[in-house]
Amino acid sequence: MLYDFASWYRRWRFGEGKRIDLVLIGPPGSGKGTQAVKIAERYNICHLSTGDILRAIIASGSELGQKVQKITESGGLVSDDIVCDLIAQKINSPECKNGLLFDGFPRTIEQAKKLDNLLRDRQIHLLAALEFKLDPSILEKRICGRLFHLASGRSYHELFNPPKVPMVDDITGDRLVHRSDDKPEALKKRLYEYDKNVAPILHFYESQNKLLRINANKDVNQVFSDIQELVRTKLAEEK
């Protein structure tokens, strides 16, 4: 009850009494994952990360979880239908009543259209799609220093967010790893694929007057401040 009151007061105090539903778009290393956590806490909305959702369904040991695990372990991509079904289940959950924050979804124009239909069927109005823009040189520096704890999905950075003990997860003490594709040449290929897939998604949201661009070259706190200002402005326009 105390948590609910604090959440209600925060939303009332800052004039955000309505639902806030957002999509975050950005390449790996753009900082959207870091900002997603801050946004979800700030507005008390449901953070839907496809990576977290897929890890959870695998951990459940269900028939679907075993199917997803086989796909991911073989290096395949989980189908749009499976991802959208899992997203739909989360959308309907009570903890998402204040709004939704989509992180890592949609990744293709087909997913964007499916998400649009999912929200429309539930009479949910997407407030905005936030695109994280940053210089390629900064992106390379961020990506190539990343460290991961595979079991939990926690991430660190050798320069910007190092673990307490080098190459060791702060919580479990497990060994951290570099992703094999977090190297300059592999990164170029990933960004080429990202740009190819994201262009129609950006056009899709821009045609709906929902696309807002974020200068992700700035530090974490300034980026978060800019996001809050954009959300305030967009909410005012929607009234």
From Swiss-Prot:
Pathway: Purine metabolism; purine nucleotide biosynthesis. Its cofactor is Mg(2+). AMP binds at residues 50, 55, 76-78, 104-107, 111, 179, 190. It catalyses: AMP + ATP = 2 ADP. ATP binds at residues 29-34, 146, 155-156. GO terms for biological process: adenine metabolic process; ADP biosynthetic process; AMP phosphorylation; purine ribonucleoside salvage. Transmembrane segments: none annotated. GO terms for molecular function: adenylate kinase activity; AMP binding; ATP binding. The keyword Cytoplasm applies. GO terms for cellular component: cytoplasm; cytosol. Its EC number is 2.7.4.3. PROSITE patterns: ADENYLATE_KINASE. Pfam families: ADK (PF00406), ADK_lid (PF05191). Monomer. Catalyzes the reversible transfer of the terminal phosphate group between ATP and AMP. Plays an important role in cellular energy homeostasis and in adenine nucleotide metabolism. Belongs to the adenylate kinase family. AK2 subfamily. Consists of three domains, a large central CORE domain and two small peripheral domains, NMPbind and LID, which undergo movements during catalysis. The LID domain closes over the site of phosphoryl transfer upon ATP binding. Assembling and dissambling the active center during each catalytic cycle provides an effective means to prevent ATP hydrolysis. This is Adenylate kinase 2.
